[in-house]
Design a protein with these regions (language model features):
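Short C-terminal domain-edge/linker segments immediately following a structured domain
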Residues: 37-38, 77-84, 104, 118-122, ...
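Broad gene-expression machinery/nucleic-acid interaction feature
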Residues: 4-7, 125, 179
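Residue-level detector of secondary-structure boundary/capping sites
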Residues: 23-26, 119, 188
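Accessory, non-catalytic peripheral segments of nucleic-acid enzymes
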Residues: 130-234
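Short amphipathic alpha-helical surface micro-motifs
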Residues: 30-32, 71, 87-89, 107-110, ...
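Gly/Ser/Thr-rich active-site loops/lids in small-molecule metabolic enzymes
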Residues: 71-75, 114-116, 205-209
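His/Asp/Glu-rich metal-coordinating catalytic cores
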Residues: 1-104
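A conserved active-site cap/scaffold subdomain adjacent to cofactor or substrate pockets
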Residues: 78-152
Length: 234
């Protein structure tokens, strides 16, 4: 068939995958420069892909999964992607966003929540149209088939959790039933908490995905922290 565009399909890069440089960010930039230089004279649109964290991108506040893949390596400057590249499609971060206000350098975002920290993220895809006139970019929003929910929003004692479960809608579990995370503040030993939760959920139109049993964590000042961010998962 006829070649109409080139794609720089770059996976997540580990040390040794990119040219030798003073740091990770510069090494990744050198690799993209080399790849783009190989095809830029052919007069066809170029699409770049990458699995990385770009400088200026936004990370979900409570979502640790967006940090673990990078493993502490430096962010990559958007300058790594030449202005002449028609579109740069990035992955790793789950929130749909432009990078440094560049319309054609984007994280499309996940089509559905990948964790309970993403319950408020807007879902959708980005449709790209590349022609002789330029690059057209359109965000297509949609509702996921099934959402995610956390009760309570912050960990609470078991009795309060059971009351919150009682307020959930009754019905059969279907493909549209939300995935449920339950957060319990364990102020005292409660060996039967899982059984009590499972019993309370019978007949509820939700799908239990996770029970996070948490202990209050004392700070050096002696104050007991009760917010979700400061709780230690058992």
């Amino acid at each position: 068939g006829e070649v109409t565009a080139y794609c720089l399909a770059v996976p997540y890069l580990r040390q040794g995958d990119y040219p030798s440089a003073e740091n990770y960010s510069k090494g990744v930039q050198l690799l993209y420069e080399q790849l783009f230089n190989e095809v830029k004279e052919k007069g066809l649109p170029v699409i770049a892909m990458g699995h990385l964290q770009a400088t200026g991108s936004e990370i979900s506040e409570d979502d640790r999964s967006e940090r673990t893949v990078i493993g502490g390596l430096e962010c990559v400057s958007p300058d790594a992607f030449d202005e002449a590249i028609a579109y740069t499609a990035l992955g790793h971060l789950h929130r749909s966003q432009r990078v440094s206000h560049r319309e054609n350098v984007r994280y499309s975002g996940t089509p559905m929540p990948m964790s309970f920290a993403e319950r408020n993220n807007a879902s959708g895809v980005v449709m790209i149209t590349i022609s002789a006139e330029g690059t057209g970019i359109e965000r297509l929003a949609f509702e996921p088939l099934a959402g995610v929910m956390s009760i309570p929003r912050q960990a609470r004692p078991l009795e309060e959790v059971l009351q919150a479960i009682g307020d959930l809608p009754d019905g059969d579990v279907t493909l549209r039933s939300p995935y449920l995370e339950i957060k319990i503040l364990m102020t005292e030993p409660e060996p039967s908490y899982k059984y009590k939760i499972e019993e309370a959920l019978k007949g509820k139109a939700v799908r239990l995905a996770r029970i996070a049993a948490m202990l209050p964590q004392k700070k050096a000042s002696g104050i007991v922290a009760t917010s979700y961010e400061e709780l230690q998962t058992i």
